[in-house]
Amino acid sequence: MGNGESQLSSVPAQKLGWFIQEYLKPYEECQTLIDEMVNTICDVLQEPEQFPLVQGVAIGGSYGRKTVLRGNSDGTLVLFFSDLKQFQDQKRSQRDILDKTGDKLKFCLFTKWLKNNFEIQKSLDGFTIQVFTKNQRISFEVLAAFNALSLNDNPSPWIYRELKRSLDKTNASPGEFAVCFTELQQKFFDNRPGKLKDLILLIKHWHQQCQKKIKDLPSLSPYALELLTVYAWEQGCRKDNFDIAEGVRTVLELIKCQEKLCIYWMVNYNFEDETIRNILLHQLQSARPVILDPVDPTNNVSGDKICWQWLKKEAQTWLTSPNLDNELPAPSWNVLPAPLFTTPGHLLDKFIKEFLQPNKCFLEQIDSAVNIIRTFLKENCFRQSTAKIQIVRGGSTAKGTALKTGSDADLVVFHNSLKSYTSQKNERHKIVKEIHEQLKAFWREKEEELEVSFEPPKWKAPRVLSFSLKSKVLNESVSFDVLPAFNALGQLSSGSTPSPEVYAGLIDLYKSSDLPGGEFSTCFTVLQRNFIRSRPTKLKDLIRLVKHWYKECERKLKPKGSLPPKYALELLTIYAWEQGSGVPDFDTAEGFRTVLELVTQYQQLCIFWKVNYNFEDETVRKFLLSQLQKTRPVILDPAEPTGDVGGGDRWCWHLLAKEAKEWLSSPCFKDGTGNPIPPWKVPTMQTPGSCGARIHPIVNEMFSSRSHRILNNNSKRNF
């Protein structure tokens, strides 16, 4: 293979794609010949007159998953025999029937003119078939199995219950019957993009090079690394076309975190069935690393810890090699080594600190990026005009709820040419266009220092300019949304509330037009920001946790429907805390559970605040009463009353509620001794006569026993 045998660390990052094509992928003509031979073998094995007991053939291993490396590779041929009627039948020796099958197959293949391209060799358990061309050899292990799926494409919960019963009855090892689900393994990989399989080839080749260094090292299943690579791509990218080097760095970083790795899928099984749920919870609480086979929940394919520890050192070596670490920042995908679902309740604070809280350096980087754009807007963008602007920072970094994984910033530009809500609607696209043109010119002047990538607008008359910024002083790219807006609040002094006239004008416009609620929420960015920024640190951490949960749900549910906005979940979290706790130090698991319980009760939710508007002004009062009579859920934006982020039937709350219900069985809601963690007692509905959100709930009615303990620890605090 020539240069293919050289150290991968010597291959430049930008050449990795070329390296895969040049040295790792099988030659096309060889692959075609191998495919033809394998198809012939499968056809022969399914000839009833020759092999009457064979009900079907499944192809597995690297060949079945289409992750074959050039040269020597592996595969499995799984023969479903009619006399294997249940899982435990596989515990009987299949040596005799496989011997006879191998002998007859050898004779049949000789008559098919394949004698120069295959070898059948006896083994302890049966036989292997080697299929080869000049430059490619695949060694297939032939296995006998019970056809667990029969004619079904998808496994039922019943089949996994039977699997567990059979394992217990026969004292078989977990995963021993995974071969019965070979077709599902193939299906799991079938719909993956070609470039992801290229990345898998690269990781497998690297692993082979590592193994050559220490031959006595316990071997790690290539399947485990394939699944790890799929997980990295699913969690961090999901694009058909991506940068191979970014994928490599991500997989290597995950290998470095092997003592935290916990990976599973719910494509063939989930937590709904009690037996399967118990299997999963047991597996997910096992010692790390855990990588569950997506087709068999009893099969942890992670293997021996020793090989992971050694692989960790090799991963660090490649990561820090000059060719892979050739640019700053060296980009990778943001992927956590373990899902939130598996984290016990008493460790949620640690999870937030390790994986969700941005560090000081991250926040300083965001501030630096914001200062670059803020300076551009103030000093460069409008210098050819008489325009006056005021810039307000919004978004999660301004609120204090930013996540570690994702650098973004919102800048609202109050432009003096926008003198009303209507002028904002009609004229803002011109300001967006001007900022776009001026930023492009600014970038051309600073090309050696800055890199700007613009996102295409979502609307014909754009209301926001979205772009990402890279700089020599930034460790990573920062995404920006710049939004022109009418300064509806004027010079609002700190601590004061807007006059009712501000809202009356907005309400009149909303009622006399077909504009959606919240259309002018950018005008009230300061109020939205202050509403959250002033909250206790631990509450903002709970918001981070809920946002992370939402992102996990969004990744899974987005293809099924439009989910409610993240802001709705932020407000729901604040409401849960106000009504159920109200103290700066509280039990995070209790708070998290309360939010999810409220999500499951979305059809009853009616939530509002009286911090910026209330029922005293007649116009506002009538409008609020009409808003509160809308289809549930109703969650009014505390900054402006036309924004109902609950939205009634507008969004697919039912999808989120179903997910929340499944999550209630998570270890997140068990304490250190395994006892269930209760939610706070929180009403789902407020009425105009209720106390609102500024008065803390009555302690005896609203606090759980665990919260009482926390409250006692904070007895010096005045309520």
Swiss-Prot record:
Its EC number is 2.7.7.84. Myristoylation is not essential for its activity. Glycosylated. Glycosylation is essential for its activity. ATP binds at S396, R544, K547. Induction: By type I interferon (IFN) and viruses. InterPro entries: 2-5-oligoAdlate_synth_1_dom2/C, 2-5OAS_C_CS, 2-5OAS_N_CS, NT_2-5OAS_ClassI-CCAase, NT_sf, Polymerase_NTP_transf_dom. A lipid is attached at G2 (N-myristoyl glycine). Changing R544 to A/Y: Significant loss of activity. One of its GO terms (cellular component) is perinuclear region of cytoplasm. Mg(2+) binds at D408, D410, D481. Changing Y421 to P/A: Significant loss of activity. It catalyses: 3 ATP = 5'-triphosphoadenylyl-(2'->5')-adenylyl-(2'->5')-adenosine + 2 diphosphate. The keyword Transmembrane does not apply. It is found in: Cytoplasm; Cytoplasm, Perinuclear region. Changing K670A: Loss of activity. It comes from the Eukaryota. Its main location: cytoplasm. The modification N6-acetyllysine is found at K378. Produced as a latent enzyme which is activated by double stranded RNA (dsRNA) generated during the course of viral infection. The dsRNA activator must be at least 15 nucleotides long, and no modification of the 2'-hydroxyl group is tolerated. ssRNA or dsDNA do not act as activators. Strongly inhibited by copper, iron and zinc ions. Partially inhibited by cobalt and nickel ions. GO terms for molecular function: 2'-5'-oligoadenylate synthetase activity; ATP binding; double-stranded RNA binding; metal ion binding. PANTHER family: 2'-5'-OLIGOADENYLATE SYNTHASE 2 (PTHR11258:SF3), 2-5 OLIGOADENYLATE SYNTHETASE (PTHR11258). Homodimer. This is 2'-5'-oligoadenylate synthase 2. The lineage of its organism: Eukaryota, Metazoa, Chordata, Craniata, Vertebrata.
